Structure formats: structure tokens, C-alpha cells
């Protein structure tokens, strides 16, 4: 039996976790996540969090600002890993909290929770640097395949990492996807993780090379068809931490302050109360990113500028 509280304390301090412990954490997480649907039902009150991207110290600040997991319900909208230097610790910490408080944490898959993307944007290299092999990366990727694709809060707010898909316009259709796989390069599962809202008249190809751009018309149709009042998503850097669009029918939440340790943005989380009122909490980056755990060592592989 694993001592989750002890592992959580070690992860919060940035300490090394033995490979065997990571294997057991990931295996137990798969067993828990496989019993959740593609779209998880979540009650209020709940706090919605956007991209984390391996910024462990800022994730700890998020919990300080919004409340401990033992007393606060959270939805994380994906992109736990890549770009930041503590992707592994950030993801494992969230898995530990999920195992310790399964009804308090909902984890949604982002476009970075894939084998292909993590090989390019830092997570793979981080694991090899810390363990000398890629086993832990492989264990985590197997967990990625079991993460939910979305969540519904009180049957009124649809949460997703990226956005909408022209191939599936109802939540019930999304529930039918076979999610336990690497994210395809096209199709509804891909679109949910890759698409972006934009001031466009109709579905348009995304410059990202995956997913679509969608506008107010598509959002209004989705809200009406599914009898929900808000789409909450992440996936795009927002300098102010959050951005509402389309008469408040969609919001982007971004939770990685000073993204990539250089963008200068603030971060936000969105609390939804029992009456579905919205309350945004803004927070700034931790100044000394190497105060906890080992000093930061950048990955050797050059990383493309922000576009994923």
C-alpha cells in the first residue's frame, strides 16, 4: 500500500520519486480513470484550472490561492506537461491527489498529453535526464490514454481542453468516442483537444495544423443543442489569465503564469459556485523558480515557440 501523503509531500518539495513508485502510481491511476466516462459529471462548487505546463511552483501557488484539495473541488483542463521544467512532478502530484481524493480532482486530457508531442516539447527529455531512461515517460503516456475528454458541471457548463468539433455537436456523441488511444491526427477526439475559438463566420482550418477554428455561431448552436450555458476551455495563452468571448458563452482559462518563464502573463482560475456564478482568481508567477528541489536545467533540445 502506497503512502500517498508521503509521496505528495515529496513531490511538493521537488524530490526524486523512485521509478517503481511511479510505475505503481500510474498503474493505480489507470485503474481509477478507466471507470470514468469520456465526459465526467462534476458538482458545484468547483474551481476550473487551465494549462499548467510543468510549472510546479506555480501549481503550488494555485492551490494556496484556491484551497487545498481536501476541501476544494478542482477540474484541470489538461496540458499538465511540457515546456516547464517540472512536468513530471506536476503530473504525478495531480495523479496523487486524484488517487487520494478521487471525487475532488477531475483531470482532462490536453493536446500535450500524447507521446508525439511530449517527445518534442520537453517531457520526454526531462524524464530521461532525471532517470537515465524513458520508462517513466512510457508509464505516464499510458495514463494519458485514460484521461477524460471533457466534463459537465451541474449539467450546465461544458469543460474541454481545446474546443468544438464539426464531427460531433452533442455531449452524448462525445461520450461514444474510444478515447483509450494516442490522440489521432484528425477527427472529433483530435478537435476537442486542438480547436480554438476565433472571430470567424464558420468552421475554418486551424493554423496549428490540427483541429478547427470556430466562432460565435458554432458556440451558440452547441450551447442551445446541449442545453448548457458556458464552454470552459484552456489551450491558448491569455495574458490576463482568462478571456470571455461570444457574449460570455465561452471562456479561456490559463493557469501558467509567466509562461515558459518569459511571457510575463498572469494566470487565473475560475470558481463556479452553486448558483453557477463565476469568480476569477488572478495570480502571478513564483519569482525564484529554483527555490524548490534541484536547480533548473533546461532541456538540450531546442523547442519551437508557442503554437501548441
Swiss-Prot record:
CDD domains, A to Z: MPP_PP2A_PP4_PP6
EC number, UniProt record: 3.1.3.16
Record field: catalytic activity: O-phospho-L-seryl-[protein] + H2O = L-seryl-[protein] + phosphate; O-phospho-L-threonyl-[protein] + H2O = L-threonyl-[protein] + phosphate
Uppermost EC category: hydrolase
Cofactor: Mn(2+)
Gene3D superfamilies, per the entry: 3.60.21.10
Coiled coil feature spans: none
Binding site for Mn(2+) 2: 79, 111, 161, 235
Stored InterPro entries: Calcineurin-like_PHP_ApaH, Metallo-depent_PP-like, PPA2-like, Ser/Thr-sp_prot-phosphatase
Cofactor detail note: Binds 2 manganese ions per subunit.
Pfam families the record matches: Metallophos (PF00149)
Keyword Nucleus in record: yes
Family statement drawn from the similarity comment of this UniProt entry: Belongs to the PPP phosphatase family. PP-4 (PP-X) subfamily.
Miscellaneous note of the record: Present with 2840 molecules/cell in log phase SD medium.
Record's function text: Forms the histone H2A phosphatase complex in association with the regulatory subunits PSY2 and PSY4, which dephosphorylates H2AS128ph (gamma-H2A) that has been displaced from sites of DNA lesions in the double-stranded DNA break repair process. Dephosphorylation is necessary for efficient recovery from the DNA damage checkpoint. PPH3 is directly involved in the dephosphorylation and activation of the transcription factor GLN3 in response to nutrient availability.
Quaternary structure, from the entry: Catalytic subunit of the histone H2A phosphatase complex (HTP-C) containing PPH3, PSY2 and PSY4. Inactivated in a complex with phosphatase methylesterase PPE1 (PP2Ai). Interacts with phosphatase 2A activator RRD1, which can reactivate PP2Ai by dissociating the catalytic subunit from the complex. Interacts with SPT5 and TAP42.
Protein name: Serine/threonine-protein phosphatase 4 catalytic subunit
Species in which this protein is naturally found: Saccharomyces cerevisiae (strain ATCC 204508 / S288c) (Baker's yeast)
Source species taxonomy: Eukaryota, Fungi, Dikarya, Ascomycota, Saccharomycotina
Gene behind the chain: PPH3
